[in-house]
Every structure is written in C-alpha cells, then in structure tokens.
C-alpha cells in the first residue's frame, strides 16, 4: 500500500497556505513549492482521512496537460523531480516525490476562469429558471447534460477557504482585468478547453466543465495551479453518455453519494470516510489518470 501524505512539514521553508488539497511554500522571492496532498474535500469541507495517491494523480495529470498546452500558453513550471529542487528539499523526498512542483511565483489573477462545454450542475438549474447561464442567453429546449454548440466562458470570484466562489458577468471580469488582459484570458481558456475536451473524448472521458487559474509573471500571462484534473473539472465517461439526465462522474461521486446517504449537514467536522468509499474514490481518480495519460503513476 502506498504511503499517503495528509500534511507536509518542510521546516526550512515558509508555509504560505494550506488549502483544501495543496500546501504552498515560499522557496525564495521568485519561486514556490506546491505540494498536492491526499486530502479530499466535499461541499467545501475537508474529510478527516485521505485518499491514497490522490495527490500524485492530480499532480501528474496537471503535468501531462501543461506539456500538451505549452504551445497555447506558457506555464509556471520550473521542475517536478525532487533531484532538480534545491538541495535543502532532498531529505523531504517522501513527502514530495511525484506530488510536488517547483514553480515561478506569478501574481495570480483575481478571477477563476470557468468554462462550460455541457449544461449541467448550477448552470442547468439557472437555465431552467431563466434560459441563461451566467449572462449567456442559450437556445430553448436544451436537455440536462447536453453539449453546448460553443463552450461558455463564465468567470467567478475567488473565495477564501470554506467560502463559495461567486459567478460574475463578463463585463465585471473585463472591468477587473482590463479589456486587453480579459480578451487574452478568455481566448486561452477556450483554446485549452477545446483541445483538452477533444483529446479526452477520444480517450473515453467527457470534460463537461472545468476551471483554470492564470497569473502574470515577468509581464506575461501564464497558466498556474492545476489543469483539467478530476478536482478542477467535471469528468464523465463517454460510454453510456446520454443527454437528458445527470451523468456519473470520475471524481468524488461515491463520496458525495455516501455523504448524502448519511445526511451530512455540509458543515465541519466531517465524518470518517469508510475504507470501501475511499478505495472506490481512489480507483475512479486512477481510472481517469490511466485513460488520459496512458502511462504509469510515478511513485
């Protein structure tokens, strides 16, 4: 059984933040160390026990996509192997190998860049009420989970840990970023999504929607954080897909279903996740990794 990492402890570096999944350290004025742990959250609440290998799976899916998209947009990556990190980090190999990246310290944009290729989730609820999704007027008669003719760029604010992001209009996002930067961000978001969506579909996965994060480094727009993972995206199996109903997913579905079953009130502290649910969840993440990358997980 693999050793899981719930929380890192790098004594020589300053811990900048411990999010729902990632621990972020400052290496120097120009570099950060991002560690993807095996923590899992549902409904914005972190569960007490981890999912084995989840951090490695998410980290390595992101590396796979960043490489695929580097001709569309540069990324923040400096190194992903502990041997290439500053020597002071080598003794923490157990906590870092396969699940961490050394990155450029970019200035993050103040918005989350969400793209919706299929109508589902909160977008479906809004459409039923208003015929719109985040200010985009859509044709009448769409079914739940139907593919949209063109993917929608629907930015949101960035909420603090435990809070919910809020959708904002394209006008508001343009105001926050300025027209030139907004246009670049929208174009990059849609280009990356379309390429990723088309590739994944051939491999048996529908990417229904996702969110990206961008930053500015040396005056240049770059992609940061995670890219097209089961945590930042809604993955559905191509097999059995049919518009007109909700779809099974490649992520925390087992966990969410179990929490619904036990009437979890969506407030911390969360209950201990049974081993069977944790194993099924790991298997789903692993299945997405294998289908997309067609490679073995780097231990």
Swiss-Prot record:
The record's listing under Pfam families reads: SAICAR_synt
**Enzyme class per UniProt:** ligase
InterPro entries named in the record? SAICAR_synt/ADE2_N, SAICAR_synth, SAICAR_synthetase_CS
GO MF annotations in UniProt: ATP binding; phosphoribosylaminoimidazolesuccinocarboxamide synthase activity
Question: What EC designation does it have?
Answer: 6.3.2.6
Instruction: Alphabetically list the UniProt keywords.
Output: ATP-binding, Ligase, Nucleotide-binding, Purine biosynthesis
* Catalysis performed (reactions): 5-amino-1-(5-phospho-D-ribosyl)imidazole-4-carboxylate + L-aspartate + ATP = (2S)-2-[5-amino-1-(5-phospho-beta-D-ribosyl)imidazole-4-carboxamido]succinate + ADP + phosphate + 2 H(+)
Q: The organism sits in which domain of life?
A: Bacteria
Q: Name one GO biological process term.
A: 'de novo' IMP biosynthetic process
Q: In which pathway does it act?
A: Purine metabolism; IMP biosynthesis via de novo pathway; 5-amino-1-(5-phospho-D-ribosyl)imidazole-4-carboxamide from 5-amino-1-(5-phospho-D-ribosyl)imidazole-4-carboxylate: step 1/2
Of the GO CC terms on this record, one is: cytoplasm
HAMAP family per UniProt: SAICAR_synth (MF_00137)
Instruction: Please give the family membership noted in the entry.
Output: Belongs to the SAICAR synthetase family.
Recorded protein name is: Phosphoribosylaminoimidazole-succinocarboxamide synthase
Question: What species is given as this protein's source?
Answer: Maridesulfovibrio salexigens (strain ATCC 14822 / DSM 2638 / NCIMB 8403 / VKM B-1763)
Instruction: Point out the gene that encodes the protein.
Output: purC
């Amino acid at each position: 059984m693999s050793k899981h990492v719930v929380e890192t402890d790098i004594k020589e570096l300053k811990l900048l933040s411990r999010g729902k999944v990632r621990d972020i350290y400052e290496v120097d004025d120009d570099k950060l160390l991002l560690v993807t742990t095996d923590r899992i959250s549902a409904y914005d609440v972190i569960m007490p026990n981890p999912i084995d290998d989840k951090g490695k799976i998410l980290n390595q899916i992101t590396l796979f996509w960043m490489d695929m998209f580097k001709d569309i947009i540069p990324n923040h990556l400096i190194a992903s192997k502990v041997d290439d990190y500053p020597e002071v980090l080598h003794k923490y190999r157990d906590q870092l190998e396969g699940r961490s990246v050394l990155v450029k310290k970019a200035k993050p944009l103040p918005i989350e860049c969400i793209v919706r290729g299929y109508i589902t989730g909160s977008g479906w609820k809004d459409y039923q009420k208003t015929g719109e999704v985040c200010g985009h007027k859509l044709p009448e008669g769409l079914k739940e989970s139907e593919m949209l003719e063109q993917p929608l760029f629907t930015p949101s604010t960035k909420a603090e840990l435990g809070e919910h992001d809020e959708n904002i209009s394209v006008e508001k996002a343009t105001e926050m970023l300025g027209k030139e930067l907004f246009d670049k961000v929208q174009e990059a978001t849609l280009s990356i999504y379309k390429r990723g969506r088309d590739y994944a579909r051939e491999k048996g996965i529908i990417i229904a929607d996702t969110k990206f994060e961008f930053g500015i480094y040396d005056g240049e727009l770059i992609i940061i954080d995670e890219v097209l993972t089961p945590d930042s995206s809604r993955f559905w199996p191509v097999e059995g897909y049919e518009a007109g109903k909700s779809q099974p997913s490649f992520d925390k579905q087992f966990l969410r279903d179990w929490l619904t079953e036990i009437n979890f009130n969506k407030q911390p502290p969360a209950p201990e996740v049974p081993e069977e649910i944790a194993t099924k969840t790991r298997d789903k993440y692993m299945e997405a990794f294998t289908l997309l990358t067609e490679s073995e997980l780097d231990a």
